[in-house]
Amino acid sequence: MAAPRPPPARLSGIMVPAPIQDLEALRALTALFKEQRNRETAPRTIFQRVLDILKKSSHAVELACRDPSQVENLASSLQLITECFRCLRNACIECSVNQNSIRNLDTIGVAVDLILLFRELRVEQEALLTAFRCGLQFLGNIASRNEDSQSIVWVHAFPELFLSCLNHPDKKIVAYSSMILFTSLNHERMKELEENLNIAIDVIDAYQKHPESEWPVLIITDLFLKSPELVQAMFPKLNNQERVTLLDLMIAKITSDEPLTTDDIPVFLRHAELIASTFVDQCKTVLKLASEEPPDDEEALATIRLLDVLCEMTANTELLGYLQVFPGLLERVIDLLRVIHVTGKETTNIFSNCGCVRAEGDISNVAEGFKSHLIRLIGNLCYKNKDNQDKVNELDGIPLILDNCNISDSNPFLTQWVIYAIRNLTEDNSQNQDLIAKMEEQGLADASLLKKVGFEVEKKGEKLILKSTRDTPKP
């Protein structure tokens, strides 16, 4: 008498053939797992069967890696692999029981090994890309909100999978691998990332190439920028474009509608140290823009962006105090403003007030704003800080700031920041007020210039008094 046939597995009231032998059966499972009730009632044995098909089909990929001529024979195997990954991907959606069952079969290790083989093939046929993408989606879903799965994914995927996928020409593969990285990273694993900085740099490059993708930007803003150790280790190794990208996202974080939290402040104080020290060391690279030789716009733009970050940081009251006493920062800003100002007056160059029309996005526009932001930063550093107010006076910074306003009628933003800086320099500082009043009396600052920046000088008896004529602009 023949042995009885095994009963078909029951999946939430739907009959599924016990031995999953073909593509149509896998597709049926994939469709069933789109519904939560089917995922929650799936028999555990079904995942072993899917894994068996996955392993069997992966042999064809292994063969193609050893013998490229076999790539043409991958079609049926790739279809099965794709559907296995889709099935497992769907089964993991918001279902920790299935995540655990699939993980405990060592499916994660099999999937990662297979995905690495895909990258090794270097064949960009659509069927291979589809299998590649579905495999990454499965890894993302099995790790989602499941710390045990995240740990196993990290063990198998780091660093090779991320090094292979984050710079892949297919943007979906970049996005899905970024999703896995974002899902798997935690505080301890960030330390491992510090020892594999190429992965962190690849994330920044991925954001540059695919700014519309949410995962790279989430990794940078929600993870990288919360790790000052990683940023400090990574920053010197970034090229100028990558630095600008990172600094732009740092500015976006500081100026976001959501203010920095109490947890963010200590982290951004560490960032402030890095940004300020780098600016003090490298800010004179901007002077290359005034040379006759073709300038390195990217290097200058990176330095200009450092200044932009410092302006936004000093506009934050929680970060301002630290930067107001940062060694050499105020002195270097005044020195740089003086050199740029003199250079612009003596020769015709990018810092000259030539009033020429420039293309949108031209480095010339950025350079023009550089002077404005130097003055803005001086104003911020002097906000309610008498030591810095006096230091600017000692360094002859007040006449320098006023002279910039005198020659820059074409730059209303510069005039705005001159007004702001002079207000902060003279607030509760009679010595600086007297200096400006005496400059007007001696003809070193004419009345029309002072009026333009919001002041006028009154003479009461033998005493000169500097009076404000307008409200202080917001920083």
Curated annotation (Swiss-Prot):
InterPro entries: ARM-like, ARM-type_fold, Ataxin-10/CTR86_families, Ataxin-10_domain. GO terms for cellular component: centriole; ciliary basal body; cytoplasm; cytosol; midbody; perinuclear region of cytoplasm. One of its GO terms (biological process) is cell division. Polyubiquitinated. It comes from the Eukaryota. SUPFAM superfamilies: ARM repeat. Gene3D superfamilies: Leucine-rich Repeat Variant (1.25.10.10). The modification Omega-N-methylarginine is found at R10. The keyword Cell cycle applies. Its main location: cytoplasm. Keywords: Cell cycle, Cell division, Cell projection, Cytoplasm, Cytoskeleton, Methylation, Phosphoprotein, Ubl conjugation. The modification Phosphoserine is found at S12, S77, S430. The modification Phosphothreonine is found at T82. It is found in: Cytoplasm, Perinuclear region; Midbody; Cytoplasm, Cytoskeleton, Cilium basal body; Cytoplasm, Cytoskeleton, Microtubule organizing center, Centrosome, Centriole. Disulfide bonds: none annotated. May play a role in the regulation of cytokinesis. May play a role in signaling by stimulating protein glycosylation. Induces neuritogenesis by activating the Ras-MAP kinase pathway and is necessary for the survival of cerebellar neurons. Does not appear to play a major role in ciliogenesis. Belongs to the ataxin-10 family. Homooligomer. Interacts with GNB2. Interacts with IQCB1. Interacts with OGT. This is Ataxin-10. The gene is ATXN10.
